[in-house]
């Protein structure tokens, strides 16, 4: 990058010196001067293509940082919807110091890969609350995605936290994602927790609310995770993870939200 700037500055100084010889300094480069500067820059970039890679990486990092800041600000603004929706399944103590919120789709392959990692964290963190935002983004493409999400919410309302988590884990344990999940898979997982479909609640309103919340947070894909203090969330203690992560990284985010470590 320094070499590029040197070339451009040299070109600029050259034409500025030419312009300085005139009676009045030029307000801008002439077409001929602009063409020459362009040729110099083009020749340099052709000889040093790694500069373009460096610039691209820097721009991408800047865009990701801006996106992260925007999502964090949205999380802080929408804390109540993230933490207090009684229609959303949760597991763990209601008075937990830290909450982990997951937006997921049962047919998402990266959600499936995240599931065992999250299960490890749940087992290792009995003092943390976990909130499960059913976000079936593949529902139109694969109907079982929506069906599994609705059944999960209905089990939560009818049977509570333990039954919901068992169902949730059982769906992922099938290993059936990306269109492979079947109605039989869903029925078997629901039957295992003694779910009564005849007395099921209407959960469309909850799904609509989750979809709206995801849009407000800037989440367009799954999985997406938010780790935050259950009270007093700020830009300094919130972690937003828009994608797959490991159990270790998730534990670090939990410690950060609890104030135990620096981010």
Question: Residue spans of the language-model regions?
Answer:
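C-terminal cap of thioredoxin/glutaredoxin-like
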Residues: 4-5, 22-38, 42, 187-263
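Short active-site neighborhood of thiol/selenol oxidoreductases, capturing the structured segment around
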Residues: 91-108, 115-118, 130, 134
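Active-site-proximal beta-strand/loop segments in catalytic clefts of secreted hydrolases
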Residues: 103-105, 133-136, 171-172, 228, ...
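Long amphipathic N-terminal alpha/beta scaffold segment
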Residues: 64-99
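N-terminal targeting signals for export/organelle localization
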Residues: 2-5, 14-78
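Extracytoplasmic/secreted envelope proteins and their assembly/folding machinery
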Residues: 34, 38, 42, 49, ...
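Sec/Tat-exported extracytoplasmic proteins
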Residues: 41-45, 49, 56-59, 63, ...
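Structural alpha/beta surface segment adjacent to cysteine/selenocysteine redox centers
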Residues: 112-191, 215-220
């Amino acid at each position: 990058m320094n070499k590029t700037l040197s070339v451009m500055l040299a070109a600029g100084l050259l034409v500025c010196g030419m312009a300085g010889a005139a009676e009045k300094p030029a307000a801008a480069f002439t077409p001929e001067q602009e063409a020459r500067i362009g040729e110099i820059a083009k020749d340099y970039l052709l000889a040093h293509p790694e500069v373009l890679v460096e610039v691209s990486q820097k721009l991408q990092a800047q865009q990701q940082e801006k996106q992260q800041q925007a999502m964090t600000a949205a999380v802080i603004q929408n804390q109540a919807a993230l933490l207090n929706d009684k229609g959303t399944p949760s597991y763990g103590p209601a008075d937990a110091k830290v909450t982990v919120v997951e937006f997921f789709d049962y047919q998402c392959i990266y959600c499936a890969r995240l599931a065992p990692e999250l299960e490890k964290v749940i087992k290792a963190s009995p003092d943390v609350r976990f909130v499960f935002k059913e976000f079936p983004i593949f529902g139109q493409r694969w109907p079982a995605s929506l069906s599994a999400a609705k059944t999960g919410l209905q089990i939560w309302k009818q049977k509570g936290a333990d039954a919901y988590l068992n169902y949730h884990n059982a769906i992922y344990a099938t290993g059936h994602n990306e269109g492979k999940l079947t109605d039989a898979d869903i029925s078997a997982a629901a039957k295992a927790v003694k779910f009564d479909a005849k007395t099921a609640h209407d959960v469309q309103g909850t799904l609509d609310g989750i979809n709206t919340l995801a849009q407000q947070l800037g989440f367009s894909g799954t999985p997406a995770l938010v780790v935050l203090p259950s009270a007093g969330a700020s830009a300094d203690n919130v972690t937003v993870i828009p994608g797959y992560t490991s159990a270790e990284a998730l534990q670090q985010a939990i410690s950060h939200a609890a104030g135990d470590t620096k981010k």
